[in-house]
Amino acid sequence: MRINPTTSGSGSGASTLAEKSVGRIAQIIGPVLDVAFPPGKMPNIYNSLVVKGRDTAGQQINVTCEVQQLLGNNRVRTVAMSATDGLMRGMEVIDTGAPLSVPVGEATLGRIFNVLGEPVDNLGPVDTRTTSPIHRSAPAFIQLDTKLSIFETGIKVVDLLAPYRRGGKIGLFGGAGVGKTVLIMELINNIAKAHGGVSVFGGVGERTREGNDLYMEMKESGVINEQNIAESKVALVYGQMNEPPGARMRVGLTALTMAEYFRDVNEQDVLLFIDNISRFVQAGSEVSALLGRMPSAVGYQPTLSTEMGSLQERITSTKEGSITSIQAVYVPADDLTDPAPATTFAHLDATTVLSRGLAAKGIYPAVDPLDSTSTMLQPRIVGEEHYETAQRVKQTLQRYKELQDIIAILGPDELSEEDRLTVARARKIERFLSQPFFVAEVFTGSPGKYVGLAETIRGFQLILSGELDGLPEQAFYLVGNIDEATAKAINLEVESKLKK
């Protein structure tokens, strides 16, 4: 991390540029530039180079590149972070003498940045003098926090069945329209309220429209506070689909660098979203091919595991704070053995799978209770009571799933008394796994609910014990804790009597 001195006047800026080594463009192949430097003035790997000048039409050009290879004969091969249109051989290239650095700290909250850490939301410059290089080593072993603790989200289905690890990595699997964005926003909202933490969202190879939609929805739901931007709970970093592979490959590191500052300096719990981690791999594959490396399995880069590891190993808990990461994972052609998802799986502590079937039933969050998994769901970590309750909930739902074919063909009357009871309880559990969200208040009109882990366990234990068998299943739909479900049942009974 670096505190930048404030520079005043143009003289100081000119003198610093004079001290930098200057090279010239020798070759341009798409986003890859070869630059020749004077002998003894070669930049280091990962140094940031800047091309400034005018194109043939007289337009100002400002392109930042990153050194990837030292070719010999005083030439380096670099990858551009923005479009190379208008660049020509012979143009001057300035070596900044350091890796790409981006602004960090509270001033980044509520703002949108590109890979270079430049604000792109038309709200003026970012008021920060503190910057940090995007290439850093992972925390040393001595700094790591080895304690296994659950990261409580206040979302019943997650906390009970696939709990998140504090400082862990979670894979979020979901197609379009199943509530991924709303779940992301609720997690951002809840971490700010319950943990006093902040969030960083890294849009890696995103559709520009989706990034814009997310920003608008965050403003609407209050996650980004337009009136007082400092009150916002999230910083956004976008490297969109239309940008060169260099930008898409590095935007995840820009977001991670901002998150690391909140963890290490502010000692906060940070939530880091990466959407989509598979596009980070894809961008790395493109860059690898452009640099002339021999491809590995299925055409991926030979350095796939190293690149993934260098990003993932920085996402961890230290004695100061934690970075808990939620990463959307795209599975090419639904093939889980593809190198990209297979390499990602090796780093994940939990998976949250969103189901289209549950979304179609109107059960939100549409988290699949049987497909979602977590390494934290062990008796020695979560305790016997939590573990037993979660296992019984899964068994009940699994039995209901097995009986659905019989119900569809023969009807519920053909089931045994025991199975009928299981189905009734499973339907209550399924509905009780739904929950009203704070960020969805604007659309639904019903206030959001944060449910603590102890309350969640108590609620499911009561359903499983049969104490609530007499209550109608709609009483369990979109409520917070179990007391709200019993109160809703009384209200439903009163309403039905009034109708009669």
UniProtKB/Swiss-Prot annotation:
Function comment: Produces ATP from ADP in the presence of a proton gradient across the membrane. The catalytic sites are hosted primarily by the beta subunits.
Record key words, sorted: ATP synthesis, ATP-binding, CF(1), Chloroplast, Hydrogen ion transport, Ion transport, Membrane, Nucleotide-binding, Plastid, Thylakoid, Translocase, Transport
Catalytic activity: ATP + H2O + 4 H(+)(in) = ADP + phosphate + 5 H(+)(out)
Protein name from the UniProt record: ATP synthase subunit beta, chloroplastic
Quaternary state and interactors: F-type ATPases have 2 components, CF(1) - the catalytic core - and CF(0) - the membrane proton channel. CF(1) has five subunits: alpha(3), beta(3), gamma(1), delta(1), epsilon(1). CF(0) has four main subunits: a(1), b(1), b'(1) and c(9-12).
Cited HAMAP family: ATP_synth_beta_bact (MF_01347)
Family: Belongs to the ATPase alpha/beta chains family.
One Gene Ontology CC term in the entry: mitochondrion
Recorded topology in the membrane: Peripheral membrane protein
PROSITE patterns registered for this protein in UniProt: ATPASE_ALPHA_BETA (PS00152)
Gene: atpB
GO aspect biological process, one term: proton motive force-driven mitochondrial ATP synthesis
One Pfam family, short name: ATP-synt_ab
GO molecular function, a single term: ATP hydrolysis activity
EC number: 7.1.2.2
Cellular compartment(s): Plastid, Chloroplast thylakoid membrane
Gene3D superfamilies: 2.40.10.170, Bovine Mitochondrial F1-atpase, Atp Synthase Beta Chain, Chain D, domain 3 (1.10.1140.10), P-loop containing nucleotide triphosphate hydrolases (3.40.50.300)
Residue positions binding ATP: 174-181
Cross-referenced NCBIfam families: atpD
Domain of life of the native organism: Eukaryota
Source organism (scientific name): Amborella trichopoda
Cysteines joined through disulfide linkages: none
